[in-house]
Amino acid sequence: MAILLAAGLGLGLAGCSAPVTETTAAPSPTVPPGIAPLRGTPVDPGGAEHPSLAVKIDNHPAARPQLGLERADLVFEELVEGGLTRYAAIWHSDVPDEVGPVRSIRPMDPEILSSFGGIVAYSGGQPQFVDAMKATPLLNVIFDDDATGLFVRAEDRDSPHDVVLAAAETVRLHSDLAEPRAQFDYADGAADATAVTAGDPTATIVTRFSESGGRAWDWDAAAVAYLRSQDGAADLDTTGTQLRATNVVVLRVEVDRGGEVPRTILTGSGEAWVSTGGSTMPATWFKDGPAAPIRLADAAGATIELAPGNTWIELVPADDGGVELVP
């Protein structure tokens, strides 16, 4: 029987929703040397001594399959116009040669990305959104202003879903920038992750950002990962492999719909659900400001530890969005 957790799109708000605790979680997480700060997995000595690369990635049906998305350490899915979603993907431990399709910046991206430092790449955007992104600590690499040749238009894709970035070369050119700080806490191994030890079995996670379609994550024990589907079909990368995540974190967020573009509010706190290893637990998310990392806490205020591996963060609107957990 499905457990309905967030209101919107006909999903009722059930009594098992995550409590909002009064205390914040522990201070910003740290990782020991030799551990990838955005993934919690081992890296070769010196292998993390370069900046992270955040890129705005298209999720329009015409943009799929995306390039390099399966190798991102972290992927944020955010609501944009027309009920569609777009990704803010961050690469650090494994940077592909190419990523894309690259799209424009949105008003919530400074709040999402400021804590990473490093580089942010995007195609352009409304002047006020570009100015806000340029005001962050990140180095901005913009297709509309590019004279370096780092961006190209792919001949086998239609505009505007055709802008591709030379990701590894972008990082190499700016290797003097600092590596990112850790954003989440990680357990020593998958079996020790908090959701595994304290959560309830979850076979499928269904999230809805609007009436325009949904996406699902199905637990695959053989793959030791959640496999992603979108609009009723497997969500594939350019090699034909289904996108997957070690951790799926759903944040219930407010959305400012007063302008032409919806703006996710990612400061403050709210309900969350953390899924790892086929289990899910309720949580509370905290973000003290744009430059602060997201913190995840259980009902007692203790820090939640993710399993080492990649993480997708679903920024589900509190008004028109919904999340459904299927045991």
What residues fall within each predicted segment?
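A surface/extracellular/periplasmic glyco- and lipid-processing/surface-interacting theme
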Residues: 32-72, 81-90, 95-327
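Bacterial N-terminal signal peptides that target proteins for export
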Residues: 1-4
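Ser/Thr-rich, Proline-interspersed low-complexity disordered segments
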Residues: 24-32
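Bacterial signal peptide processing site
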Residues: 17-20
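C-terminal motif of bacterial Sec signal peptides marking the signal peptidase cleavage site
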Residues: 12-15
